[in-house]
Regions:
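Transmembrane-helix signature of polytopic, membrane-embedded enzymes
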Residues: 3-6, 10-12, 93-116, 134-135
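Specific aromatic-rich, kink-prone transmembrane helix
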Residues: 90-92, 113, 132-149, 157-162, ...
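Transmembrane-lumen/periplasm boundary regions of multi-pass, lipid-linked membrane glycan transferases
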Residues: 175-271, 285-290, 294
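Short acidic/glycine- and proline-prone juxtamembrane loop motifs at membrane-interface regions
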Residues: 119-133
Length: 391
């Protein structure tokens, strides 16, 4: 619903109702599907909390602990941080939309649009470091827009979100690219002559202390591990197109509408919009550069996809509803498929083994695993397979 009618329909009360209903849906999905291997890994780590871990910061693990105490060792408890992160994204959309010149309608439409994408609908009920980092990224985007508009206190909000986002997942560093336009926006550049940005920077650095404490205790294995993931191959555009295409896939047909909305926004020259475009594109820019050297995981671009929901809410075009409805239908079908497969995966695999010509038997896992960045894990498992076993 757009235009004057949509603005009248989306009252604050309906906005809160939307958030409540979406959170309920996320909770039902979370409680109804078995946890994955990654989620079990996070659960196991949360039973022995530490400053950080070898391959991840620990914020998502810490947040899991009170829910496990309250709800027991259940899928809902394990996934509660993801449910809360999705709610936080919705809550942050409203002040961000207002900063960009919109109101409740834009925030509500953007949040609804995200539910027409597989990565958000499923990711809101699946605990991961990505969804938590994305919530902090949206908060940091709001702060950057406010800074660009002359709000100096927003540096503290940016520092809080950047620091805690880094404690959620290391790719949060992409948000620093969003600070670049502040160098040529007069109101923002003037703030650099005051102590506030620099003190806020020290505050953000202090919030990341758990990562450095763990690293100092373990010969910096967590940092060295991240540097070891940088590909050493020659330059190629192959993986850039693969990364961008995979992000379109994660957003289903709704992603086509996102791309058109980005194009339509190019004429916005207000300081807030200039800053918003930069911070929204930052993850895609950074990891597309990484993709020049090798494969990167598609979901690292998730903050760009989430903020693209707002981009489309502000810049609808003829035919955008058809694209998003088609994307929503595809996402709903995928959700049903997830329910069917996860109810009894052992039986599904057993049937595939007895029917060599079945679709499942013809599916190649290597393309999927490369898209999400688990090639080494799959190769290790494949080397240990016995005859007739599947990865």
């Amino acid at each position: 619903m757009s235009g004057a009618g949509g603005r009248q329909f989306w009252t604050l009360q309906r906005w809160w109702l939307l958030l409540a209903l979406a959170t309920l849906v996320h909770a039902v999905v979370a409680a109804s599907t078995p946890i994955s291997g990654d989620e079990a890994y996070y659960w196991d780590l949360s039973r022995r909390p530490d400053w950080a871990t070898f391959d991840q910061p620990s914020l998502v693990l810490w947040l899991m602990i009170p829910f496990r105490a309250l709800l027991g060792e259940t899928a809902l408890a394990v996934r509660s941080p993801a449910i809360l992160a999705s709610l936080a994204i919705g809550l942050a959309f409203l002040p961000l939309a207002r900063r960009l010149g919109g109101d409740v309608r834009e925030a509500a439409v953007a949040y609804l649009l995200l539910h027409a994408t597989p990565f958000f609908l499923l990711g809101s009920s699946y605990v991961s470091t990505d969804v938590l980092m994305t919530a902090w990224f949206v908060g940091a985007a709001w702060a950057i827009v406010a800074i660009a508009q002359g709000e100096r206190r927003a540096w503290w909000g940016f520092a809080l979100c950047a620091g805690l986002g880094f404690n959620s997942k290391f790719p949060m560093v992409a948000v620093l690219i969003g600070l670049l336009p502040l160098l040529w926006i007069p109101k923002a550049r003037a703030q650099l002559a005051t102590p506030t940005p620099w003190l806020a920077g020290l505050f953000a650095l202090a919030l990341t202390a758990p990562v450095w404490i763990w690293g100092a205790q373990h010969d910096w294995d967590n940092i060295l591990f991240q540097f070891g993931r940088v590909p050493e191959a020659g330059f190629t555009l192959k993986y850039v197109f693969e990364f961008l295409g995979a992000n379109l896939g994660l957003s289903s047909l709704t992603g086509v509408a996102f791309v058109v909305a980005w194009w339509k926004s190019r004429h916005r020259r207000e300081p807030g919009w200039v800053a918003f475009r930069w911070v929204a594109a930052a993850p895609l820019i950074l990891f597309a550069l990484f993709a020049l050297r090798g494969r990167v995981a598609a979901h690292w671009g998730a903050p760009t996809l989430v903020l693209s929901g707002l981009m489309l809410a502000f810049h609808p075009f003829r035919g955008w509803k058809a694209w998003t409805l088609a994307g929503g239908a595809t996402t709903a079908a995928l959700l049903v498929l997830v329910f069917v497969v996860t109810r009894d995966p052992a039986e599904l695999v057993a049937r595939a083994r007895t029917q060599p010509e079945s679709l499942l038997a013809r599916v190649r896992a290597d393309k999927l695993t490369s898209a999400i960045g688990y090639e080494e894990t799959v190769e290790t498992l494949r080397a240990q397979l016995r005859a007739g076993e599947l990865v």
